[in-house]
C-alpha cells in the first residue's frame, strides 16, 4: 500500500433481486459507507428507487464527519453531521 492509498477492509453486498439491496464497506483510511435501497410503488407509474445511507470519514483534524442521505424521486437530500 502506497502512502495516500486506501484498501478495503470490509465489504458487504446483498441484493434480493426483487427491488431491495444493502451494501457497505470500510477502508483503511477510516471511510465507512452503508446504504440501503428499495423500489417504492413497484410496478406502477410512480415506481421510484429510494436510497438511504451514511458516509463517515476521518478528517485531517482527527474528527469523524458524517453525511446521512436520502435519494429518491425528490432528489438527493444530504444531512451533514459532525
UniProtKB/Swiss-Prot annotation:
Disulfide bonds: none annotated. Coiled coil: none annotated. It comes from Schistocerca gregaria. This is Endocuticle structural protein SgAbd-6. PROSITE patterns: CHIT_BIND_RR_1 (PS00233), CHIT_BIND_RR_2 (PS51155). Component of the abdominal endocuticle. Keywords: Cuticle, Pyrrolidone carboxylic acid. Residues 18-82 form the Chitin-binding type R&R domain. InterPro entries: CHIT_BIND_RR_consensus (IPR031311), Cuticle_Struct_Prot (IPR050468), Insect_cuticle (IPR000618). The keyword Lipid metabolism does not apply. GO terms for molecular function: structural constituent of chitin-based larval cuticle. The lineage of its organism: Eukaryota, Metazoa, Ecdysozoa, Arthropoda, Hexapoda. GO terms for cellular component: chitin-based extracellular matrix. Pfam families: Chitin_bind_4. The modification Pyrrolidone carboxylic acid is found at residue 1. PANTHER family: ADULT CUTICLE PROTEIN 65AA-RELATED, CUTICLE PROTEIN. It comes from the Eukaryota.
Amino acid at each position: 500500500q502506497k502512502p495516500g492509498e486506501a484498501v478495503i477492509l470490509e465489504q458487504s453486498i446483498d441484493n434480493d433481486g426483487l427491488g431491495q439491496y444493502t451494501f457497505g464497506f470500510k477502508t483503511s483510511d477510516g471511510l465507512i459507507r452503508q446504504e440501503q435501497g428499495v423500489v417504492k410503488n413497484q410496478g406502477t407509474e410512480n415506481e421510484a428507487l429510494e436510497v438511504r445511507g451514511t458516509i463517515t470519514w476521518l478528517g485531517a483534524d482527527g474528527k469523524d464527519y458524517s453525511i446521512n442521505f436520502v435519494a429518491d424521486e425528490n432528489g438527493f437530500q444530504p444531512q451533514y453531521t459532525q
